[in-house]
Design a protein with these regions (language model features):
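Hot-dog-fold acyl-thioester-processing enzymes
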Residues: 1-56, 112-139
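Residue-level preference for beta-strand/loop junctions
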Residues: 4, 51-53, 69, 85, ...
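Generic short beta-strand
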Residues: 10, 90-93, 108
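Conserved GNAT-family N-acetyltransferase fold
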Residues: 28, 91, 104
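Hydrophobic beta-sheet segments that form the core/acyl-binding groove
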Residues: 58-96
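Glycine-rich beta-strand-turn "strand-cap" elements at beta-sheet edges
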Residues: 60, 109-110
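Residue-level signal for glycine
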Residues: 98-100
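A structural microfeature
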Residues: 102-104, 120
Length: 139
């Protein structure tokens, strides 16, 4: 499991003065892609013409988060389905107090960027994912 700290900016704040529905998902995906750049998977996705595609996301909102608040982003790749073309990912956003603010559980698959079809990912991509985030059960 990998994590990073994020300071919430005004672009994620809704009319209620807290991070809104779209804001939480944007924070999570922005941090996810930044993390992918840091570990080199963004380039690997392009080199190997295979990248993740999300089919569904379930978001549980547990605590309010406000502008300028520091939160911690954590990502886990959960035990994959038997079909190796698919994946399950959990993203957690924690308040600085340690309280869980948001849980995002997503299901997706690996997408061949040339054929535009679902595929089994190359071993090189899976080795990077196994090294950087893995958890054996959904919490």
């Amino acid at each position: 499991m990998k994590s990073k700290k994020i300071v919430v900016t005004s672009k994620y704040i809704d009319q209620n003065g807290h991070v809104g529905e779209a804001g939480y998902l944007s924070i999570a995906i922005d941090a996810l892609w930044e993390f992918n750049r840091e570990i080199g998977t963004s380039q690997k996705f392009l080199q190997l013409s295979c990248a993740p595609v999300t089919f569904s996301s379930k978001i549980d909102y547990l605590k309010e988060v406000f502008e300028h608040e520091e939160i911690e982003f954590r990502i886990e790749r959960l035990t994959p389905p038997e079909d190796k073309r698919k994946w399950i990912r959990k993203i957690l956003l924690f308040k600085s107090s340690g309280e869980l603010a948001v849980r995002i559980l997503a299901n997706g698959a690996w997408f061949d960027l040339n054929s535009r079809k679902i595929t089994t990912p190359p071993n090189e991509i899976m080795e990077i994912f196994d090294k950087n985030f893995y958890d054996s059960e959904i919490k």
